[in-house]
Structure formats: C-alpha cells, structure tokens
C-alpha cells in the first residue's frame, strides 16, 4: 500500500524547488565585483606591458585572464541558478549549477597546475635570467589584488559560525582560485628576493614547482567535493542515520533510504517504510521536522503484507 502526499498548490510546488544557498545573492554580487576588479587589473597589466614592452607584465596579465574567466563562470552560474530557480523543467531546482561551475573551475585549476609544473621543471633544467627589479613589484601588486579579492569573497559571518561542510562550493572554487594565486605570489616574492639577494637562479622555478603542487592539491580537493555532489554521493552519514532513526522510531522498518544534495545547505531524501499499521504520510513526515538542511522529502509507506512488486527496481 502506498500513501500519497496531499496535493500542493503551484506556488508551493515552485517554492519547494528553490534550493539556493542562504547567501546566494550576496555571493553573486561579490563575485561579479571581484571579476570586475580582476578584469581591470588585467587591462592595466596588458596596457602597461605593451607600453613598456615588458613580457613579464604581459605574462602576468594573461595569467590574470584565467582568473577572470573562472570568476565569470562562477558569477554566471549564480545568475542562471537564480533566474531559473522557479523553472519546473529542473526537477530538483537549480542549486547544482554552482557545483557544476565549481567542477569546471577545478578542472581549470588542475590544468593550470600541470602547466606550471611543466614550465618550472623546464626552467630548473635550464634556468633563465630574471629581471628581479621589474618582477618584484609585479608580484607584490598581484598579491595585494588577490588579498582584496579574497576578502571580498569571504563566507558570510553566519556561514562561518555554522562551520557548514556543505557550504557554497561555487564560492569556494572562486575563493580557491584566488587563494592559490595568492600563495603563488607569496612564493614568487620569496623566490625573487632570494634570486636578487643571493643570485639563486633556481629559486624562481623551484617556487613555481612548489606552487604547482599546492594548486594541484587545491584542484583535487575541489574536484572530489564537486564530483561527489554532481554524482549524488551520500553527503552525510550522520544525517542519514538520524533520518533512519526518526522514521523507524515507532517500530517501522526502513526498507530503502536515499539522501543527496540539492544545493548549498539543502538536501533531499527518499524513503520507503514498512509498517504493521500504516499512518498517513504526514504522520511520518512530522518526525523529520526540525532537521537542518533537509529541504525535500518523498515518503512511500507500505503495509506489512504489501506486494514487493510495488517497490523500487534497482538495476
């Protein structure tokens, strides 16, 4: 026997499928601001490089272009998710657009790490002369811009207070791009100082190789997190256990239970229960009230003698 949920109005139906993060608009606005700052820096570097014929400035500008692209992808994902939040063509809302953008930016980070490592290894084998006097202020300026942008993209106070492991991955990806670049700038400053002071020509490529390893570590971490969300990996064994315990608190048997992410701070659950004396679905749904982050629940309740053919078919 299956007990269906009571019918809902269209407005309620749409509201139930808006699974955006609590700070969605704030994060979208700040991501666009940071993208604009990086774009302005990019233009300044390219114009300055062309005017002074400095390859270092032009190279730094092209490097900044990768960050601008990553930030535009992140900001566009916010805008699209918000614009289509009520579009019923998306069965479970648009909250996962941020995970998709985060995954794409993680791939860019990984490719960047590989290219950095290749260039650094080549320069370790055959060190090239570096204009330390010109390169130091460029690295320092890049670090200042990155620190400003990192501050702008910091999580909100409420998010930090909750230590939410299922926070906004799109923001995390943009933040990691800038954090990785800031780390590269710090390593570059140290290497350039060592090269200028002690003549260590190997310091610059060695710092580049270390930075590549750091960026690669960031990329792998982000790929795992975004990939898990996109592939509907169970996000929380603790929440799954709590749902199971609450649904079976009256002696019912939980035959099937699935939990997955819908968006930042939002989860969905599907459960199949078997009860000797089935109650209306709202009776069991009430047991799950108050569970933070559980935004969508689908329940199927069967009597003890229900035909197994009514169950799900897991291929």
Predicted regions mapped to residue ranges:
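Alpha-helical transmembrane segments and adjacent TM-loop junctions that form the membrane-embedded core
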Residues: 2-20, 26, 62, 70-80, ...
């Amino acid at each position: 026997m299956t007990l269906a949920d009571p019918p809902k109005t269209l407005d309620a139906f749409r509201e139930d499928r808006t699974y955006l993060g609590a700070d969605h608009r704030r994060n979208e606005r700040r991501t666009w601001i940071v993208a604009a700052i990086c774009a302005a820096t990019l233009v300044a570097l390219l114009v300055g490089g062309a005017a002074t014929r400095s390859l270092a400035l032009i190279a730094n500008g092209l490097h900044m272009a990768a960050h601008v692209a990553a930030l535009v992808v992140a900001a566009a994902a916010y805008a699209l998710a918000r614009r289509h939040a009520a579009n019923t063509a998306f069965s479970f809302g648009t909250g996962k657009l941020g995970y998709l953008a985060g995954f794409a930016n993680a791939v860019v980070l990984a490719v960047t790490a590989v290219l950095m490592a290749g260039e650094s290894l080549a320069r370790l084998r055959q060190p090239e002369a570096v204009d330390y006097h010109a390169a130091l202020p460029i690295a320092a300026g890049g670090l200042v811009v990155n620190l400003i942008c990192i501050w702008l993209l910091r999580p909100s106070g409420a998010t930090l207070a909750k230590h939410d492991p299922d926070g906004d991955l799109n923001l995390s990806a943009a933040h990691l791009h800038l954090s990785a670049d800031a780390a590269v700038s710090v390593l570059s400053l140290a290497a350039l100082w060592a090269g200028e002071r002690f003549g260590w020509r190997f310091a610059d490529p060695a710092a580049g190789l270390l930075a590549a390893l750091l960026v690669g570590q960031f990329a792998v971490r982000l790929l795992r997190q975004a990939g898990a969300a996109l592939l509907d990996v169970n996000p929380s064994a603790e929440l799954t256990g709590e749902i199971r315990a609450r649904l079976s608190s009256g002696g019912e048997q939980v035959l099937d239970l699935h939990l997955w992410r819908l968006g930042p701070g939002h989860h969905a659950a599907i459960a199949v229960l078997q009860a000797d004396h089935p109650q209306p679905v709202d009776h069991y749904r009430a047991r799950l009230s108050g569970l933070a982050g559980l935004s969508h629940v689908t329940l199927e309740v069967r009597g003890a003698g229900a035909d197994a053919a009514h169950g799900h078919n897991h291929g």
